Amino acid sequence: MRVKFSLLSLLFVLAVSTQVTFAKEPAEGLAVKAISENNAEAMPAIEELRSLGPAGMQTLMHRYDDEIARHIANPGMAPTPEWLRITAALDAVSQQRNSYLSGLYWYTDLEQAQRVSAQSGKPILSLRLLGKLTDELSCANSRFFRTVLYSNAAVSSILRDQFVLHSQMVRPVPLITIDFGDGRKLERTITGNSVHYVLDSDGKVIDAFPGVYGPQAFSRVLRRAGLIHKPQRKR
């Protein structure tokens, strides 16, 4: 009986140790596993990187910065299976489609964003949109934000350094399908409204930027909002 009990205890300790080791695995190792062809290995690594917040996203960006730089310099380059796994991991960690262009990390839980805002002293920039920021066919405005604003080096630097980023789907984006009658179909969104709110750490709206802006204009309103509405850090 004592031998059986000892064996069971040993197995339990080994199982717990394995779980703890994975949870404490260095982020660099998680970044490698995140693009594994084995989903059973990739998905837990992606979830762990996501739980690390912006630091997890930056680890992934730094690990694959050579590949990212090549695809930014050559946008017409045919995607390899490895590149598709890299972008899938980046988008899952960041919760933004084509996030390799911006390197931004978006919270999808407002309460979590508020806690980070209170701890960091940064205001929250909350994007409310139709669809999700990870969707290929999110609302037209959010697609513009991804391709023109968030990918801009000056804009992404301000967003990353001065704000806690949060996105929230208000409702699914309306879609229209055009059937050409010959087997071809075209699916497009039919509305595109979205808005950026500036929130304090209590979630109170203190500013709003509806509609679309060019990168320079958006940078100006962001800087102004960051200076005026910066909350006090809670100790």
Each predicted region: which residue ranges?
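Thioredoxin-like thiol-disulfide oxidoreductase module
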Residues: Y107-Q119, F144-D207, P215, R220-A225
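Short active-site neighborhood of thiol/selenol oxidoreductases, capturing the structured segment around
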Residues: S120-L137, L165
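Ligand-binding pocket scaffold of soluble enzyme catalytic domains
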Residues: L52, I124, Y197
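Non-globular targeting/processing and membrane-anchoring segments
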Residues: K24-S102, A118-Q119, Q216-R235
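Bacterial N-terminal signal peptides
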Residues: S6-T18
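The substrate-binding groove and active-site-proximal loops of carbohydrate-active enzymes
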Residues: S99-L104, A140-V148
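Positively charged n-region of N-terminal signal peptides that target proteins for export
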Residues: M1-F5
